Amino acid sequence: MASEAEKTFHRFAAFGESSSSGTEMNNKNFSKLCKDCGIMDGKTVTSTDVDIVFSKVKAKNARTITFQQFKEAVKELGQKRFKGKSPDEVLENIYGLMEGKDPATTGATKATTVGAVDRLTDTSKYTGTHKERFDESGKGKGIAGREEMTDNTGYVSGYKGSGTYDKKTK
């Protein structure tokens, strides 16, 4: 059971921290773990309790806690959450709440394609000069589609038959 709790600890410790190795957890991720796993219920254990316990177990000048300190914090929160139970029973209940949990990303925005987005990104519906920027498959033409490329090889500016003069005279 403790190994499952340790896995959950490492998942939450690394959550949102690209530089974190997952061995130490900061206060933000500790609060998230307590909230997502149901340790913090809002009545007997509040966010204030979680912050106070975190501050108690961490070293004086540290900002993070290790798994060992985490276990102490969980014991203390468990005593408050499950009143009247033995410390071992409390620890089992807390580990049971944590089992198999992952950091939830509630409220995170997801990409959606609404009617306007479909209409604006469909290159077959483009008109005017924007139509020239894409080929039939919808792939962009690059700079050739964005700029008017002038061909200065003809006789005069509007001359279309460049390179055909020699063929006509012979």
From Swiss-Prot:
Tissue expression per record: Expressed in spermatids. Detected in liver cancer (at protein level).
Biased composition (Basic and acidic residues): 129-149
One Pfam assignment: p25-alpha
Main location: cytoplasm
Alphabetical keyword list: Cell projection, Cilium, Cytoplasm, Differentiation, Flagellum, Spermatogenesis
Region (Disordered): 127-170
Subcellular location: Cytoplasm, Cytosol; Cell projection, Cilium, Flagellum
Signal peptide range: none
One cellular component term from this protein's GO annotations in UniProt: sperm flagellum
One BP annotation, GO: spermatogenesis
GO terms assigned for molecular function: tubulin binding
Keyword Cell inner membrane among record annotations: no
TM helices/strands, residue ranges: none
Family membership noted in the UniProt record: Belongs to the TPPP family.
General function of this protein: Probable regulator of microtubule dynamics required for sperm motility. In contrast to other members of the family, has no microtubule bundling activity.
PANTHER family: P25 ALPHA-RELATED, TUBULIN POLYMERIZATION-PROMOTING PROTEIN FAMILY MEMBER 2
Protein name, per record: Tubulin polymerization-promoting protein family member 2
Protein source organism: Homo sapiens
